[in-house]
């Protein structure tokens, strides 16, 4: 009769893994996905170096109180914002953790197109520091912006869902895939605002058996990047149809026209 195999000690297994990882870091130090520089092995983030994380630029103020689009100091506070004036009333606020400037753009690209889903955790860490307006501060449900089936097959994951799950875990919320995307609308990247709105018109539906998660509740819509808000507006309208009371959008990065930042000529303050 064969002698029973000794049970492995979980602690020793973890120690062995830590040793192997430390040894691998000495032989092949991890490189930052944003700048290709060497990451300090003591840095727990590991995918993006401390310097690149410090270069993520906050959205400058003054800004629109609804969508946080930067305003010139000379703008009137009651002046209609061109960025969000076409949004549905149900999309009450939008906030972003940083501007879509280097290295944020490289981080987003690595998550979406270079097969680095683990970056969703780093992105969620940054998003968890965003101060939410009172209207959605107590929202308990995070809803990811859905992707198409074709992109899901190609990419292997929906980056918005990964971000939403990580963000919800950090902030004590739940995640629910209430929305689904119909057909293949094509990428929004090269489209102008009017074309973006047309491209996503009717592109989303809510899943009836999951609608109870958002009915009569405030909801946080989660995505990686806010550009014109066309996708978020279409999603918010669909969530409102499902019974959501108010919808706030939170993204990792916000795309800003470089001319807008240049015209401010330093008049805006980051905060």
Located regions from the model:
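Glycine-rich phosphate/pyrophosphate-handling loop used in enzymes and phosphotransfer proteins
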Residues: 1-271
